[in-house]
Curated annotation (Swiss-Prot):
Coiled-coil ranges from the UniProt annotation: none
Positions of the catalytic residues: 174
A GO molecular-function annotation: oxidoreductase activity, acting on paired donors, with incorporation or reduction of molecular oxygen
Domain of life: Bacteria
Keyword Ligase set for record: no
One of the GO biological process terms: tRNA modification
NCBIfam families: PRK00142.1-4
Role played: Catalyzes oxygen-dependent 5-hydroxyuridine (ho5U) modification at position 34 in tRNAs.
EC top class named in words: oxidoreductase
Reactions accelerated catalytically: uridine(34) in tRNA + AH2 + O2 = 5-hydroxyuridine(34) in tRNA + A + H2O
Descriptive protein name: tRNA uridine(34) hydroxylase
Amino acid sequence: MSFVIATFYHFVELSNYYDMKDEIKAACNNVELKGTILLAEEGVNATISGERNAIDKIFDFLRSDYRLRDLTWKESAAEYQPFSKMKVKLKREIVNLGVSNLDISLRGKYVDPEHWDDFTSQPDVLVIDTRNEYEVKLGKFKNAINPHTQCFREFPQWTESFSESKDLKVAMYCTGGIRCEKSTAYMKSLGFSDVYHLKGGILSYLEKTYNKNGNWKGECFVFDDRIAVDNSLTPSNTIKCIFCSNQVSTDKLKSVPRGQVVCSDCKLQCYSYNK
């Protein structure tokens, strides 16, 4: 059996998000979907998986809410169900930057995946990866700046040491688009005026460009049991240990906490993975 994996987010005011939880959970359970949907006053963020008909039905349901009528999503496929249960969670933020009163309407301009390579090759464009360190170690765009953050909440702290001119163009990217979109709003709140982000993130880039120019190097970490996908969005069987670069079976990583992409030897030697 083949499963459709759909990822989506949408920044929109959901003042009644508390009341939406049970109804959305029931709709997902009725069509046997699994995955996680996050709801907050600022919008929705999710990755869900199920059969083709179930995915179609849930998006018909979600888009029947006028606030979500413009909801779009990205799809990939797997031969197994990458989630064990269906969860709908209430959050303060749909992606946790930890900055209060951020005006998301300040967000930067989209760069379509087909234009990303040409745009980021310009000498006056700085490319910033907004993902976590363990994600960047698996793969990144050439010449992208790595902030070396362990979680998204550390990004504002990193910007305090970011000394580049605010007149430069800044292009930001992440896995599916949500972190880079929110971080562009934050960068603009700091006074950077020419800020851009990759529409749909790395997953959309790989889907639409096939990485034909080789600008993407490595694999892309994903937040489900696939662990990582390659250039063709196919789940990887093995990936590099982020410490020693030896290959690790992704099957061995499905039951460990998020981000622990390490081989057995490094796990024993590294205190942070042996608590």
